[in-house]
Design a protein with these regions (language model features):
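A broadly tuned "polar low-complexity/structure-edge" signature
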Residues: 1-2, 198
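Generic non-transmembrane alpha-helix signal with a bias for helix starts/N-cap capping motifs
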Residues: 90, 190-191
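Non-catalytic alpha-helical scaffold/packing segments enriched in small hydrophobic residues
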Residues: 136-139, 193, 197
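Ferredoxin-like iron-sulfur electron-transfer modules
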Residues: 168-190, 196-197, 201-212
Length: 212
């Protein structure tokens, strides 16, 4: 049996997780935030984590998951989705698991359209990424199915580790300058889907609109 724990904000990582799961036999999907709310001992022999890259690193909630998840699988894989660069994300995942005497057997990255406000991708590039994604995810899934091991190649070295951290801090500083997130009242129909699907539970509804 196999399980893929995923975190997805815009849908890229959920799409990747579903694509990989379809290629594996008897594989189920579980949300990382759901697991953290109700943790249990994972019995599956194959455990995967699929998540986006945030500021060239793993999202804090994924970091917390890797520090807390109860598991002793035979094979662990980590797949990250990104707009341009994965930074230190794979090496970070490897190190977090190593600290718990667990081994990240396989790590991979796949480029998909990003939602960066600071560095938005041109439309032509986004369309190209979407065309290439099925083949890239298919290869990743086959590698996982065949228990491919690239443990020795997951470290990015000094430049990626500390350069990624510096770049991430710079991006976060730019994001803070955009101010508070608000809803476009003339376009919002009050469906509540944003509150339902937000993986971190950061959106609440008030009077039929997302509360600010």
């Amino acid at each position: 049996m196999a399980v893929i724990f995923y975190l997805s904000g815009t849908g890229n990582s959920l799409y990747a997780a579903k694509s990989i799961a379809q290629e594996l036999e008897q594989c189920r999907l579980e949300g990382i935030t759901g697991y953290l709310k109700a943790p249990y001992e994972v019995q599956d022999e194959v455990v995967g984590i699929v998540c986006p890259v945030y500021c060239m690193a793993l999202p804090p909630v994924v970091e917390a998951f890797l520090q807390q998840v109860k598991m002793v699988p035979q094979y662990i894989f980590l797949v990250v989705t990104m707009g341009a660069m994965s930074g230190q994300a794979l090496g970070q995942g490897k190190e977090l698991l190593k600290q718990r005497e667990l081994r990240l057997s396989y790590g991979a990255q796949v480029a998909l359209p990003d939602n960066s406000i600071v560095f938005p991708s041109p439309q032509a590039r986004q369309e190209k990424l979407l065309r290439n994604a099925p083949a890239e995810l298919g290869l990743i899934a086959r590698n996982i199915k065949n228990k491919y091991d690239n443990y020795q190649h997951l470290d990015r070295g000094f430049l990626w580790k500390y350069g990624g951290t510096a770049a991430g801090m710079w991006v976060l500083d730019k994001i803070k300058q955009f101010g508070k997130l608000s809803c476009a009242d003339d376009k919002c129909v009050g469906c509540g889907i944003c509150a339902e699907v937000c993986p971190a539970g950061n959106i609440t509804m008030a009077a039929g609109k997302p509360a600010e």
